[in-house]
Amino acid sequence: MARIAGVNIPNHQHTEIGLTAIFGIGRTRSRSICSAAGVEFSKKVKDLTDADLEKLREEVGKFIVEGDLRREVTMNIKRLMDLGCYRGVRHRKGLPMRGQRTRTNARTRKGPRRAAQALKK
């Protein structure tokens, strides 16, 4: 298994698909990394030479990926919450922040339904 950016890339996959195992790299960025490194993206990871892997590591190093990207996203959300802007408040309350309806639906963001309380008469 090749190790790039602290992630083990599966040997049996094509380079284009294997690079997507790294957080922050999708198919498009994977293709651009392969072309910039001069590596054929249809080549299997196990068939890559050490020189190819080094070129890929160098190209991936130009982007913010894995832990740094996760930290940046978390800090961006925290900044919104500290500002007290609309999006930050919605993050804090655990509600959708992009204008979706919440009277019904929004179950993914709100979590499972709570049991209804019995009314006393």
From Swiss-Prot:
Entry-linked Pfam families: Ribosomal_S13 (PF00416)
InterPro entries: Rbsml_uS13_C (IPR027437), Ribosomal_uS13 (IPR001892), Ribosomal_uS13-like_H2TH (IPR010979), Ribosomal_uS13_bac-type (IPR019980), Ribosomal_uS13_CS (IPR018269)
Origin superkingdom: Bacteria
Keyword terms, alphabetized: Ribonucleoprotein, Ribosomal protein, RNA-binding, rRNA-binding, tRNA-binding
UniProt keyword Calcium present: no
Region (Disordered): 93-121
GO cellular component: cytosol; small ribosomal subunit
Assembly behavior: Part of the 30S ribosomal subunit. Forms a loose heterodimer with protein S19. Forms two bridges to the 50S subunit in the 70S ribosome.
Protein role: Located at the top of the head of the 30S subunit, it contacts several helices of the 16S rRNA. In the 70S ribosome it contacts the 23S rRNA (bridge B1a) and protein L5 of the 50S subunit (bridge B1b), connecting the 2 subunits; these bridges are implicated in subunit movement. Contacts the tRNAs in the A and P-sites.
HAMAP family, per database record: Ribosomal_uS13 (MF_01315)
Entry similarity comment: Belongs to the universal ribosomal protein uS13 family.
NCBIfam families from the UniProt entry: uS13_bact
Protein name, entry field: Small ribosomal subunit protein uS13
Organism of provenance: Burkholderia vietnamiensis (strain G4 / LMG 22486)
